[in-house]
Swiss-Prot record:
InterPro entries: GHMP_kinase_C_dom, GHMP_kinase_C_sf, GHMP_kinase_N_dom, IspE, Ribosomal_Su5_D2-typ_SF, Ribsml_uS5_D2-typ_fold_subgr
Catalytic reaction annotation: 4-CDP-2-C-methyl-D-erythritol + ATP = 4-CDP-2-C-methyl-D-erythritol 2-phosphate + ADP + H(+)
Active site per UniProt: 10, 137
Gene3D superfamilies: 3.30.230.10, GHMP kinase, C-terminal domain
GO biological process, one term: terpenoid biosynthetic process
Positions that bind ATP: 95-105
Source domain of life: Bacteria
Native source species: Limosilactobacillus reuteri (strain DSM 20016)
Associated pathway: Isoprenoid biosynthesis; isopentenyl diphosphate biosynthesis via DXP pathway; isopentenyl diphosphate from 1-deoxy-D-xylulose 5-phosphate: step 3/6
Family stated for the protein in its record: Belongs to the GHMP kinase family. IspE subfamily.
Encoding gene per record: ispE
Protein name: 4-diphosphocytidyl-2-C-methyl-D-erythritol kinase
Amino acid sequence: MIVTEKAPAKLNLSLDTPMRYFDGSPQWDMVMVSADLADYVTVETHRRPATIKVYTNSGFLPNDQRNLAYQAAHILRSRFHCKDGVTIRIKKQIPVAAGLGGGSSDAAAVLRALNSIWRLGLSLSELAKIALTIDSDVPYCIYNKLAHVTGHGEKIELLPPQPHYWAVIAKQKISVSTPQILRQINYEKLQHLNNEALLTNLKKEDWQEATKYMGNVLEPLTMKFYPEIGRLKNKMKELGADVAQMSGTGPTVFAICHTESRAKRIQNSIRGFCRDVHVVTLL
C-alpha cells in the first residue's frame, strides 16, 4: 500500500526558553504555525525485503538511521511489531538545516502514513507522544496547526485559526549549528517574551495586536555569529512586513504580510542577495 503525506514547514511566531532541564535540554515556550512550503513524503510498505529505505531528491540529507523519517518508521514498526519493509521517498522543497523543521515534518508525515497503512487507529495525540521520542519538533508537526507548544515539545494547545496571511520565507547561504546556539544561552541575561499577551490576543483573534508580542529570544545569539540575519530582518521590516524574525535557531528569516502584493514586493526586493525566497500562505 502507498500513501503520500504533505509535510509543511513550521515557523516560530514566538520562541522562548524559560529554563534548562536537569538533563541540559531547554524547556520551550513557543507559538508555532505551519506554512504552505512543504515536502511530499510517499510511504510504501512491502513484505520483502523487510528493510527500511529512504530516498530523497536532496544530496544534503542522510538516507540511513540518521534521517528522522527513517527513525519514525523504525520506532513505529518496532512498537507495534510490524514485519513489513518500508520505502520512504521524500520530495524536498523545504530548505535543509534552515530552522523550518523540515526533517521533523517528514518524520511526522511518516508516522501519519504508517498509522493509516497499518490501520493502527492511533489518535493524533497518541502519535504525538510517539513523535516526542524522535525530536522535540515532531509532536507539533503531527498537527501542523497554530499552537502553543511547551515543555520538551510535548504539551500542545491548539489555537483558533487566524485570518489569511502571507509569509515570505528567506534562507541565506549560511548554515547554523543548533547545538552551538543552544550552548550560548545564558538564562540570567535572556530577554524573555510576553507570550501570555501573545496568546491572549491570538485567542481573541486579534492578529494585529498579537504581532506586537511575537519574537525569538535566540535571535541575538545567532546574529552574534551571523549578523547578515539581522540585516535581512531589518530589510524586510523596511519593506513593510507586519512581522519579520528568525525561525528556530536560524538561519531562515520570515516576514508576515496581510496582503500578497506586499509579500511579493518583499520577495522581489531581497532576491538580489538571497536567492532561496518563497512566498506562501500560513496554514
